Amino acid sequence: MKSVVTTVVTAADAAGRFLSQNDLEAVQGNIQRAAARLEAAEKLAAGLDKVTREAGDACFNKYSYLKQPGEAGDSQVKVDKCYRDLGHYLRLINYCLVVGGTGPLDEWGIAGAREVYRSLSLPTGPYVEALTYTRDRACAPRDMSPQALNEFKSYLDYVINALS
């Protein structure tokens, strides 16, 4: 994956020129976004267990029928697997924040996820609800800076849209 820095420098070199003010502003913007992503990744990692638990609890509160016999969360083992899956998605979002792209989610979280859930008769709606709760609950400056929160929410939206 080419970075903005590599792209800008390569274009300037190909044109045989120094970096322009616009080039430098693009690089600076990229560095600022990277700093925001790293802040979001750090905050998410520090609170992963709490975020996962709150998201899962919100999901099971909204979809309480899931704990009824024959449903996706009818045993503690199945409930624990739901929390595990939520933690997995949040961990992949953490990786995306660090690398600055959706590659980890695309490769390890989304590709085939809907088909797997469908084949196991697991609804994706509760996962969407849990991740939506996380997105809507997060707030700046309580949780992280506004720019970091924007980066975090963009990856939450990406997963929500993929599972919807």
Swiss-Prot record:
It comes from the Bacteria. (2R,3E)-phycoerythrobilin 1 binds at residue 82. Contains two covalently linked phycoerythrobilin chromophores. It is found in: Cellular thylakoid membrane. SUPFAM superfamilies: Globin-like. Keywords: Antenna complex, Bile pigment, Chromophore, Electron transport, Membrane, Photosynthesis, Phycobilisome, Thylakoid, Transport. GO terms for biological process: photosynthesis. GO terms for cellular component: phycobilisome; plasma membrane-derived thylakoid membrane. Light-harvesting photosynthetic bile pigment-protein from the phycobiliprotein complex. Heterodimer of an alpha and a beta chain. This is C-phycoerythrin class 1 subunit alpha.
